[in-house]
UniProtKB/Swiss-Prot annotation:
Superkingdom of the organism of origin: Bacteria
One GO cellular component, as annotated: ribosome
Keywords: Ribonucleoprotein, Ribosomal protein, RNA-binding, rRNA-binding
Any one GO molecular function term: structural constituent of ribosome
UniProt subunit comment: Part of the 50S ribosomal subunit. Contacts protein L29, and trigger factor when it is bound to the ribosome.
PANTHER family listed in its UniProt record: 60S RIBOSOMAL PROTEIN L23A
Pfam family, one: Ribosomal_L23
Family: Belongs to the universal ribosomal protein uL23 family.
Gene3D superfamilies documented for this protein: 3.30.70.330
Purpose: One of the early assembly proteins it binds 23S rRNA. One of the proteins that surrounds the polypeptide exit tunnel on the outside of the ribosome. Forms the main docking site for trigger factor binding to the ribosome.
Protein name: Large ribosomal subunit protein uL23
Length: 98
């Protein structure tokens, strides 16, 4: 896979912002088939920084109920499952996209 296929998007939330500022951890939404080595290589290629370590989490899909305007359930569905990557960098390294 190419680097742009592995890294889907950065995750920008309050929790990820505090982690980025305090312990220099960046969080990305990644391809479900990517592994740690591929994620590390993609970060190195795209942002020109060398990650110290990388942790991956599989986020399971959740059941959802589609509700009509009157409040009646009219169908059931699921959200998509996805994968999250925590990328640890050295203190002096930064990623400029954030």
């Amino acid at each position: 896979m190419k680097a742009y296929d592995i890294i889907v998007s950065p995750m920008l939330t309050e929790k990820t912002n505090t982690q980025r500022e305090s312990i220099n951890v960046y969080v990305f939404k990644v391809n479900k088939r990517a592994n740690k080595k591929e994620v590390g290589a993609a970060i190195k290629e795209l942002f020109n920084v060398t990650p110290v370590s990388c942790n991956l989490l599989n986020i399971k899909s959740k059941a959802k109920v589609v509700v009509s305007r009157k409040g009646y359930p009219i169908g059931k569905g699921k959200t998509s499952s996805w994968k999250k990557a925590y990328v640890y960098l050295k203190k002096e390294d930064k990623i400029d996209i954030f």
